[in-house]
Amino acid sequence: MATDTAPACIHVALRDGVRDLRGEQVACDAARFLGIDTGRVRTSRLYAVGRNLSRSDLERLGREGLADRILHEVTVGGRPESRGARTYVLVGRLPGVTDDEGMSAQATMADLLALPPGDGAQEVFSSEVYLFERDLPPETLARLAEELLGNPLIHHFEYGPVPDRIAYAPRVRLPPPAPPRFVDLEVSDAELERLSKERVLSLDLKEMHAIRDHFRNPEVRARLAALDRPGLPTDAELEIFAQTWSEHCKHKEFNALIEYHDEDTGQTTVVDSLFRTYIRGTTDPIAARLSASGQDWLVKVFTDNAGVVRVDSERLFVLKVETHNTPSALDPYGGAITGILGNNRDPLGTGRGGARCLFNTNVLCFGPPNYARPLLPGQLHPRRVLEGVRRGIEDGGNKSGIPTVHGAIVFDDRYAGKPLVYCGTGALLPSRVGGRNAWEKEARPGDAILMAGGRVGKDGIHGATFSSVEIDRNSPRSAVQVGSPITQKRLADFLEAACLAGFVRCTTDNGAGGLSSSVGELAPLAGGAEVHLDRVPLKYEGLAPWEIFVSESQERMTLVVDPVHLPAILEVARLHEVEVSDVGRFTDSGLLEVFHSGARVASLDLDFLHHGVPSKRMRATWRAPALTEPVLPPDLDWGHLLRRVLASPDVASREWVIRQYDHEVKGRTVVKPLMGPDGTAPQDAAVMRLGFDDWRGLAVSCGIVPRYGDIDPYAMSAAAFDEAVRQIVAVGGRLPDPDASGGTWWSACDNFCVPDSAWHPTENPDGDRKLGALVRMCRALKDVATAYGVPLTSGKDSMKNDFKEGGVRISVPPTVLYTVVSGIEDIRRTVTSEVKAEGDFVWVLGRTRDELGASILYRLLGELGANVPRVRTDEAVGLYRALASATTRGWVASCHDCSDGGLAVALAEATFGTGLGLDLDLGPVLDALGDAPHPVLSALFSESPSRFVATVAPEHQASFEASLGEHGRCVGRVTADPRLVVRARGAPVLDLDTLDLLSAWRTDPRGGEGA
């Protein structure tokens, strides 16, 4: 790739005297994290203009289109005023990387100057310029550029003494692509493995053999001979197989035949597909019970881009949660923004299309921000990953007009190699679209294949296959993408209008694998497809046909359209400024055929493409670790411990993240992430209003506790699902009742992220034990979800979450996230977590047990323990139903679930921002603990699941006690004195100022206080 380095340039900088907050942040971070004294830092924007404009037009564009007249000064050509700066760094995008700001500036230029339309190619490019007061040497400037200001995978850097002219325009100049070629698979096994690795196919030897044997088939050879071609796959066909058969798309390990051996019991069982046994095996029986009782809200599960449930006769709710772990490890900002935008497209591409995104969620797992171990080559520091991912999620949601309403952050050293980035989206879809059921998908022979949205480039090539392997320093740059929220917003608005008008038969997104995936998945609906790649709009010339077909360039959808509607849909696209291209037709040939400039580059049998992948056979083992409870000192300071727990990274406030996300856009958020009189108290679940013509809403929550898996993955998975469910119950949700009429709809999404679990005697000798952990996690999911009657509607697995370099492997702990959404009949009856009034009674609901194993407290004490928290569904179901009934009757003033840190944390959090306190005696809790060795410690910090802290106004106390008495005990009152006072059968335990506790909780895990 080549670049133009002398375009016309417009510099937009803050005027002297205007505070440069970005520059101040850079100076602070450089000193704090890199130990570099930059002096004063000034920032500016550089816009390189490729069009031949007069100087007066350039000046007008800068003044009227790109700058604020009060805040900014504009310089055309040269550089911004240096004002004493001695060195600089320019951060621009590499050729071909998405430049949303540049494209927006280009649209502004066209509108402002009334320019004739171009050919769609980018003509304006944006960059950032940093001017430093200090005379910094080149090696220091390089560190600033690569470790703080940008990422070499996606950015171009220039630095040195401040020159007279600063300019950069990343135009792409690719050599002509190599012609399509045939790939000889009649080679040795070693050569097949080398081919798979070099082309980033991520296919194992058995799969390479299957492809080779397919092309040996006499019928296949005869069909290909009739096309006047040899019986060998083309490079495009090999890439299509790799995409379609990738772990990302085919979920081969979740569908494998697994021999599971329990070394503790000596029993061996065979699991024929984790998915069919434990996930579909959970939902299908629940669906049958719902159907038998006349409940019809479970509409579509597992067969589309997202799960669909019925809200009422007019509306459907669509839920999807995806992961974007590998891209976020390479480029945290780009990985996160493409993750959330890509996940938005899943609901948009469900059924016939026409959904409107309602909310986003994000759950993030990072290495600790103060990670002190030496970084491996290619490994980014967790602090940098955290900030990049946070910014990506912020821009992905805020700039798309979608509120980010719920989430969580988990810290653990084992996420320092590869973070886990879970992106969730809920959407509303009309029940009928274009006079037909909205959830149905269909394609007919002769229907047009349209591609709508962004153009295609090299970005994202091999994203699907690359996500199926561990990462290292040699991970391919082409797998990285950067999203465009503006392009996607236009695309979403266009799609909604076109679908509701009845112009679209169905749609799907161009996600992993691009056109190869979207057309390949839709083709069986009609019986075949024919695609012409020369009709696909490109960002730049020089892409090989196979690259065009598998590229994952973002913000694209594939539409199935009756040709009679083509003029109408193209007009809708014009009105929404969305590029739409007619790239082919669906057929009934039984083939996926791909052409470029008249030449056939792929002709594949659809049946073999989708069903020919060999099934895996895997081995899994389990043995419970030999653990004991620690011996603790007798003189522990409970108040000091509580402050430490509140300040710990996994418990401390997330306000430093929450305040940067927009959770209010759309005006439907009822229960927000932080509530209370001063917006400080953390909430258990988000509640949103569905519309403005009634009081119906929904609650969304999540559950994730990977640390429990260090003792027992079964207990971890069960606790995570219970957490997600009880958080919804805490705000006023009701458990579903599959055996009764008139139940409330629920939708749950499972997302498993595990390290490489495929056993290999030398490369992965403990793979069988990691797979054994996954089997236990899935078993727990089925047991708990079945007991609660909550169906799984969609999900995703990510199976290779490892970073390996120089013989060192950093693997994530087995992790599962459950995202759960439930209908709320009346949002006016929902409850928040903070206490409300002096004199209210305080209840602890659910039984506290001696279950400190893997707790936050034990982690702070450097212990693991043995008594892991375990879910007892028989107790939980009764409590959840009784609490929901009491909430519906208006008896509950506040309710907060007990989770990370236990009861003591829940009590403290319930007071935050209220100016109120609690006066409690935990005698009833101690009674339930029996002969626990450290009863007060367990009462305060045990993380037994299925528990709540609730408050009840005096006028409702008798009714509440009659309804909930068997499930909990009253332990005290809310007071006007802002102190947390706790006794144990009269003996003092805690007497703490709640403002001091709030201060501890607001510790910023990145370092410092004042979250």
Task: Give the label of every model feature segment.
Residues 3-16, 43-48, 83-95, 126-130, ...:
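Short glycine-/aliphatic-rich beta-strand segments at the starts of folded cytosolic domains
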Residues 11-22, 53, 90-103, 134-137, ...:
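Short, surface-exposed ligand-recognition loops at beta-strand->loop->(often short) alpha-helix junctions
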Residues 12-14, 47-55, 91-93, 129-138, ...:
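Short beta-strand-to-loop capping motifs
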Residues 24, 28, 56-71, 99-111, ...:
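Non-catalytic interaction/regulatory segments
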Residues 25-82:
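Acidic (E/D-rich), amphipathic helical modules within compact regulatory domains
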Residues 39-43, 111-129, 133:
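Interaction-mediating elements
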Residues 69-118, 123:
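Short, solvent-exposed interaction modules
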Residues 96-98, 118, 131-133, 151-1011:
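Glycine/proline-enriched, intrinsically flexible loops and inter-domain linkers
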